[in-house]
């Protein structure tokens, strides 16, 4: 966990670069309530996020129990309706329109009580589209782990099944790997296809009702409006694209 914390800046910077609207919680205790009674989101200042993360990992509520090596059971507890309901500890964390990324960290095999695929299918059932669930993990690689860790069996299979990122816990530097995990944990809309062929100079793009004259371009080949990396709309934004159709006399 110390190595993850030390490289967490790479994770946050990657999310910020695409204006991701994220919630990041850390579940350590058996009840699944997020450590510190809070989660990270883009409204918090960067320095505050690092302080909150430290409290999540090392604070008084970060008390491991029977689920220490049972990531699937921890995920199940955290996302249990008992914890997600009104007034409950993780209320508001799970969102219908957001990708659900579940990240396990361990130097042992996963010892959850059930079979890994049953857990994957359960978490996929929480979303309208099963593809909106992805597992990532930091642990011992197959087939026999590495110098300081056993093979992270169960979690490795869940990562492979959902197309996530698996990082060897024996890697000396997690920064690049955490960047990859961040990129694989968000749905980024860079391009918006148009239903008709426009006269390019008539295209008007509005984000939350405000006309944006820069930060995007029209791709003739794909017939899409494509946003540049530093101008990607924040998650949940309203995007409106107006244009005159080729051959339209009106």
Regions found by a protein language model. Give the residues of each.
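Divalent cation-coordinating acidic motifs and surrounding scaffolds
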Residues: 1-222, 233-237, 241-250
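Extracellular adhesion/glycan-binding regions together with long Ser/Thr-
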Residues: 224-229
